[in-house]
Regions:
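Conserved short hydrophobic beta-strand within the ABC ATPase nucleotide-binding domain
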Residues: 157-160
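Walker B catalytic acidic pair
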Residues: 116-118
């Protein structure tokens, strides 16, 4: 239960940062909410003992904190079922930005942002809003297969291409 309490407390700290990041990127009046869902309550040891034969049969444990999950909703509707790809991607990006924001708030240090190919699933307005949401003092490394967003970036960005294992300016 200690792990679950820590996770629930962390999510409570992250929730306002997630909502703000989503509003900044989404640009709409969509309300995102995230709740922690523990897989099961009760004594984990007892549950593991009771399911040992089944766990061996399946080759994996059926109980434990690895089965916990997040319930994410947009405007009260299950995001996994009803959100568009852009909305789902915006939610995932918002969660990462929220982690960065909370880490900066707690430590006083801005983390490095490693961003892997997020632009293919975002419309142009969300791309620009995402770039504007990155902290100005953060080092951000962005990989992409789409370069069209680079021309609409809010400020000039150095760009490189990786070719035959070597970096070369674009």
């Amino acid at each position: 239960t200690e792990l679950r309490n820590l996770r629930a407390n962390l999510l409570a700290l992250l929730a306002p940062h997630i909502a703000l990041a989503y509003r900044n990127i989404g640009g709409r009046q969509e309300q995102v909410s995230i709740a922690y869902r523990a897989s099961e309550e009760g004594d984990l040891y007892e549950r593991l003992c009771a399911s040992m034969d089944r766990d061996i049969r399946y080759g994996q444990t059926q109980n434990g904190p690895h089965r916990d999950d997040l319930d994410i909703t947009l405007n009260g509707r299950n995001a996994a079922q009803f959100a568009s790809e852009g909305q789902q991607r915006t939610t995932a990006i918002s969660m990462k930005l929220a982690q960065s924001s909370l880490l900066t708030e707690e430590t006083g240090h801005t983390p490095i942002h490693l961003i892997d190919d997020v632009f293919g699933e975002l419309d142009p307005s969300r791309r620009i809003a995402f770039l504007q949401s990155l902290p100005a003092d953060a080092q951000s490394l962005i990989t992409t297969t789409h370069l069209d967003w680079l021309h609409n970036a809010p400020c000039p960005l150095p760009a490189f291409r990786l070719e035959d294992g070597a970096l070369a300016p674009l």
